[in-house]
């Protein structure tokens, strides 16, 4: 039962709302009468002359709606005493709409009139209409018009609209530079745009392509600007292959000594050692990286079953997979390449299979020095780390190894504090976190809840707060300073519970459980969402995908999207930006 005081408060609020509505209704009625009088030219004290049209109005109404008219009618300007006021360079229909707005507070903004309305609202200082136009244009921004909207916003002093348009231009630059609007830009705007660090591109060669495209559109007249334009391209960031085969062969470059020097400087950069490269600043600042994240699943025990999952549209796409069948392996993604390592068939597999997602090509490298299965792996700063695992039929290992992708060499690092296999491992903020697992593949082996972290800078391990639940074969993902352990199994069977490790607080907390118990869970995170895409329950596999929103702590069982059919699969998030579109066809 509600308290008497709360009932009175609620009643007062209701009464205030009703009173406000009544006041608004009365005001609208008064203004409606005044608008009718205006149309009948009753008591009008000013006529706006717009080209051939005469628009009657009341000074007090115009002055209350427009700061422009307020100054005009309340100062010693000539128009303050004139019955007829001429508005030069104005459109009659637009002024008619603005006058109507002054009386009714209503106006229709659409794609046909928004630019004219915004221009007039800005000139006559009618802020509500200006805001409506800005809000409308912000919703309409796309690749075909964003450059024009940015120019318009700058001319009309609309910083909020300009920021929206510019942000779109930078985020979608690879689409924008292929439009006609880009080709029509003046040299000042092009040089400013190409100089932005926030251009979102797959690689710097796209900025080069934009520059050359603009220059060639009107080559005779734009020839004098060639050096200024190409100076904004960061040639050291372009691949050596593209520089030598495409850029150096471009006639525009060959015919200009200054531009040729830029290209040669870019090629020299690739001959420098990593240490010497770090000393260079000019022309080497990276742009904002364009991403197209998908989740790759590889069949493992069924190698021909490999697919991408696209979290944007929930589609599955086949991946060509010729690699060897292997059980209990691991996979990681780094710099366009998926590395599949470890695992066994009859014996541990020594080879590491590599898949370049951009080139859609497979090749092999030497695998971990100690071949084993049930290991875990993750990547950080150009290095692939592998931990634990089990040599066939044996106990879990303390082993910790590192593969340097730059030198293509393996190195043994300090061992973990605890031996473990069938565990989880993730990179977070430059550190390597290892959680759970078991002391061996035998069913009787103890399942672990212990956790530890490795610092590559000091090459040391530190024990962390243990998980609330001991688990193995679980999913382990990093999302915004939290590490989530999802499902898996303890000594008694499958788990539906989920917990996260708060990195800052060094503590684990339980969250909402999965709507499914998984002995084996295959999951990955994109953004704030954790996707469970495959798994085994003990008597059957996961039928449909599950989604967990880490921000709302809510699970969704998506009955429209089937799960990946292979429960022993390998899973990792990949960036397919720049991949051949044929590779990604469904």
From Swiss-Prot:
Pathway: Protein modification; protein ubiquitination
Residue ranges of every copy of the BACK domain listed in the record: 146-248
SUPFAM superfamilies from the UniProt entry: Kelch motif (SSF117281), POZ domain (SSF54695)
Compartments in which it is found: Nucleus; Cytoplasm
Pfam family, one: BTB
InterPro entries in the cross-refs: BACK, BTB-kelch_protein, BTB/POZ_dom, BTB/POZ_KLHL7, Kelch-typ_b-propeller, Kelch_1, KLHL7_BACK, SKP1/BTB/POZ_sf
Molecular function via GO: protein homodimerization activity; ubiquitin-like ligase-substrate adaptor activity
Record PROSITE patterns: BTB (PS50097)
Repeat found in the keyword field: yes
GO biological process, one term: proteasome-mediated ubiquitin-dependent protein catabolic process
Claim: Repeat is one of the keywords in the record: yes
Sorted UniProt keywords: Cytoplasm, Kelch repeat, Nucleus, Repeat, Ubl conjugation pathway
Cellular component terms per the entry's GO annotation: Cul3-RING ubiquitin ligase complex; cytoplasm; nucleus; perinuclear region of cytoplasm
Kelch repeat placement: 294-336, 337-382, 383-430, 431-481, 483-528, 530-575
Positions of the BTB domain: 44-111
Function: Substrate-specific adapter of a BCR (BTB-CUL3-RBX1) E3 ubiquitin ligase complex. The BCR(KLHL7) complex acts by mediating ubiquitination and subsequent degradation of substrate proteins. Probably mediates 'Lys-48'-linked ubiquitination.
Assembly mode: Homodimer. Component of the BCR(KLHL7) E3 ubiquitin ligase complex.
PANTHER family assigned to the protein according to its UniProt record, in alphabetical order: KELCH PROTEIN (PTHR24412), KELCH-LIKE PROTEIN 7 (PTHR24412:SF435)
Name assigned to this protein: Kelch-like protein 7
Native source species: Gallus gallus (Chicken)
Organism placement in taxonomy: Eukaryota, Metazoa, Chordata, Craniata, Vertebrata
